[in-house]
Amino acid sequence: MSSRKVHFVSLGCPKNRVDSEVMLGVARAAGFAHVDDAAEAEVIVVNTCGFIGEAKKESIDAIFEMAQHKEHGSCKRLVVAGCLSQRHPEELAREMPEVDHFLGSSDMLKLGRVLAGDAERMLVGNPAEWLIQAGDPRTLSTPGGSAYVKIAEGCNRTCSFCVIPDLRGAQRSRPIPDVVREVEQLAAAGVREINLISQDTIAYGRDAAGRSEGGARATLAQLVERVADVPGVRWVRLFYLYPETMTDDLVELLAGHPRVVPYVDMPLQHAADAMLRRMRRGHGGDRLRRVVSTLRERVPDLTFRTAFIVGHPGETDAEFEELCDFVRWAEFERVGVFRYSDEEASRSYELEGKVPARTAASRYRRLMTLQRRISHKKSAAMIGRELEVLVEGTSDEHEYVLMGRHAGQAPEIDGQVYLSGGEVRPGEMCRVRITQASDYDLVGELLDDEESGRGAGLPPAADLGAVTAKRRVALRVLQTDGRERQQN
């Protein structure tokens, strides 16, 4: 084992996690071993989130926490990367003399120069300079048999509240063959679930980078079908869809392809026409109702996850009530609610009618309470059903209880299925009968091979402990709500 050690802290979204995994791969290729304890590390890397005020604060707190190890630990070099340094490079460099190097949101591969000892302090480049490729080094940090795959970078939208285009640049789609090569590598290592992510997944292929050599435009449906056909892949899941163009062929894949899970992650942000105009979303509430109705009608057993913003400038009591009515009507399985963050670089920063923080907090609580009742009803309806579950590992609370997820539960955000009644390994797919339910989590009993029909169509599970021991590490992940998880 290498005597040179590195520790990573990753903040924010799954897209940032992939960037952290690339830097982990760069570090490993440079001869560094990853350690869970920051006090043991010669180099510490903090991959930051700079999307909203709360995320910026958590990133800054994490940086200062890690800086303590330069005084009291083994740390000789502290590196700050990601969206926060992309957004505020000069300010951070001035206010944080403890930091030795700054990398931006597209500078992951530059970590190699830092580790080699011949890099300048400021390495923040153009956010549109980099797009991940299958050949880039990467060390997985996700649990069990699951991995995220970035299919594009950047965004061309102009939503009022969002600064992502400034942080990540314009949309750049990966060619289908390159994405497929990466998925093939992951499947060969035992990964069963492929989670396709980008800033604007529905827009995949519309930019020049996504076109084939012949000039034909790649489509998201074409990509999804190719990924789902990779041997060893059991689930393909889509994140960050936009309610603009859900093509028939994409809906058909969600409805009928045996390896494309009937799961839609589509942040709708609001439902009132006036609010959607202020947010510059490009559609009204009627469009959203049509999209939801179409997906419910055409995709059997659909799980619909969405997100809303409350407290955006100009939001009235009546518009908030319209949003609540919409949520009651739609009965989404999963909803994330965010209080508006007034970011100076956003278009909404200049809008009048700022909503008091107390009002926004009250609306947040009301909408979450409403959705919690809906989610509990949806979870209770799962009792008695038999589901396919991807086993991820042992429960944090009970070492003798396994946990996993069914197709309607995305990694980290949608709850777990807690398992009893048998022995299975992380990365294995098994059949489970649900016996209990809470608002978000389920409890189930493993069915034996004969009862579940296991083995009739499911490939044998890879031993992830053996196959990916050299590629998978524990990554300290700080989510933007302040929760910390140790992912194995």
Swiss-Prot record:
Residues 380-448 form the TRAM domain. One of its GO terms (molecular function) is 4 iron, 4 sulfur cluster binding. GO terms for biological process: tRNA modification. SMART domains: Elp3. PROSITE patterns: MTTASE_N, MTTASE_RADICAL, RADICAL_SAM, TRAM. [4Fe-4S] cluster 1 binds at C13, C49, C83. InterPro entries: Elp3/MiaA/NifB-like_rSAM, Methylthiotransferase, Methylthiotransferase_CS, Methylthiotransferase_N, Methylthiotransferase_N_sf, NA-bd_OB-fold, Ribosomal_uS12_MeSTrfase_RimO, rSAM. Pfam families: Radical_SAM, TRAM_2, UPF0004. Residues 4-120 form the MTTase N-terminal domain. Its EC number is 2.8.4.4. It catalyses: L-aspartate(89)-[ribosomal protein uS12]-hydrogen + (sulfur carrier)-SH + AH2 + 2 S-adenosyl-L-methionine = 3-methylsulfanyl-L-aspartate(89)-[ribosomal protein uS12]-hydrogen + (sulfur carrier)-H + 5'-deoxyadenosine + L-methionine + A + S-adenosyl-L-homocysteine + 2 H(+). Its cofactor is [4Fe-4S] cluster. GO terms for cellular component: cytosol. Keywords: 4Fe-4S, Cytoplasm, Iron, Iron-sulfur, Metal-binding, S-adenosyl-L-methionine, Transferase. It is found in: Cytoplasm. Residues 141-377 form the Radical SAM core domain. It is an enzyme of class 2 (transferase). [4Fe-4S] cluster 2 binds at C155, C159, C162. Binds 2 [4Fe-4S] clusters. One cluster is coordinated with 3 cysteines and an exchangeable S-adenosyl-L-methionine. Catalyzes the methylthiolation of an aspartic acid residue of ribosomal protein uS12. HAMAP family: MTTase_RimO. Belongs to the methylthiotransferase family. RimO subfamily. NCBIfam families: 30S ribosomal protein S12 methylthiotransferase RimO, MiaB/RimO family radical SAM methylthiotransferase. This is Ribosomal protein uS12 methylthiotransferase RimO. It comes from Sorangium cellulosum (strain So ce56) (Polyangium cellulosum (strain So ce56)). The lineage of its organism: Bacteria, Pseudomonadati, Myxococcota, Polyangia, Polyangiales.
